[in-house]
Amino acid sequence: MLYCRSGFEKECAGEIQDKATQLEVYGFPRVKKNSGYVVFECYQDGDADKLAKGIDFSALIFARQMFAVAAEFEALPSDDRISPILAELSEIEAFPRCGDLRIETPDTNEAKELLKFCRKFTVPMRQAMRGKGLMWNKDNAKKPVLHICFVAPGHCYVGYSYPGNNSQFFMGIPRLKFPADAPSRSTLKLEEAFHVFIPREEWDERLAPGMWGVDLGACPGGWTYQLVKRSMFVHCVDNGMMADSLMETGQIKHHMVDGFKFEPDRKNVTWIVCDMVEKPARVAHLMGQWLLKGWAKEAIFNLKLPMKGRYDEVLQDLENLKTFLIENKVKFKLQAKHLYHDREEITIHIQCLSNISPH
């Protein structure tokens, strides 16, 4: 089972189908429009576990969470929802002993009405699971996570995900608060990208005070805000006006030029960030150029998606970008994700692993 943004089930299904085929696991995705999830039905027993282990979760773009389904309950009795789940799981020999329990719903308005029930249900369910030996007596982040996902009252999928190959967040969504002094809500996209793409223990080194960043298409400054907040200096490139609150920090230089034409005058930039409303292929190529020329070491940027053929567009743009970097002998690590705060767009992170001689 995979969670995704409502309206992106088709893209999520295309992706799981591709990844399963690569692992020689065969089946088909069950897709219900705007449901916020996809269930991939495997033809062979044990294949769901193979996918939960074998698919690199961080390589999935459209999935917010992934777990192997062990059982589906379509009509749990309202007076006792615990016993049928315990009875079923106790019969499954291969079900792993779990270290954490998450009782969740897909991210739709209808399903989220069940969240209050999910919260109330968690403590008695956890106690019952521990009593049956299905969970360890103490929370253990190194053990599998037990997921119960309610898609409707009395209708749930029960399964497990593996630590290090799942989303650490409840429902696959980081809980971020909008900072009152940020100039636009887009600031949360970049903050979420830092949480998703950069391990927390590396923040001090890779998002360090005193670094220089460049923000293309910066105004009014939602993304710049995240860099300034981390005591960085920023070249803001946009013909529009920047928020006064950012200008007053003394940490930014505003360049009123086209983002596609700006060139940094010194090679001291660590971060290039970009959230321009432009054709995705054009933005991807621009970011490739920045990294190739040694103008930045890391990039986070958004690719706006077309109305149709979104998955194909993403695959094509990423393939072209990877090919461009490989042909130019740039060593890199690339991640892409349809973040919670993204809408008709995805966010890409590229870290340069090789020092490139200036061209």
From Swiss-Prot:
Enzyme class: transferase
Presence of keyword GTP-binding: no
Function: Catalyzes the 2'-O-methylation at nucleotide C2498 in 23S rRNA.
UniProt xrefs under Pfam families: FtsJ, RlmM_FDX, RLMM_N
Positions bound to S-adenosyl-L-methionine: 186, 219-222, 238, 258, 275
UniProt GO cellular component terms: cytoplasm
EC number of this enzyme: 2.1.1.186
Source species, domain of life: Bacteria
Keyword presence, Cytoplasm: yes
Active site positions, chain numbering: 304 (proton acceptor)
GO MF term set: S-adenosylmethionine-dependent methyltransferase activity
Catalyzed reaction equations: cytidine(2498) in 23S rRNA + S-adenosyl-L-methionine = 2'-O-methylcytidine(2498) in 23S rRNA + S-adenosyl-L-homocysteine + H(+)
Keyword line: Cytoplasm, Methyltransferase, rRNA processing, S-adenosyl-L-methionine, Transferase
Locations listed in the record: Cytoplasm
GO BP terms: methylation; rRNA processing
Alphabetized InterPro entries for the sequence: RlmM_FDX, RlmM_THUMP-like, RNA_MeTrfase_FtsJ_dom, rRNA_MeTrfase_M, SAM-dependent_MTases_sf
Binding partners and assembly: Monomer.
Family, per entry: Belongs to the class I-like SAM-binding methyltransferase superfamily. RNA methyltransferase RlmE family. RlmM subfamily.
Protein name: Ribosomal RNA large subunit methyltransferase M
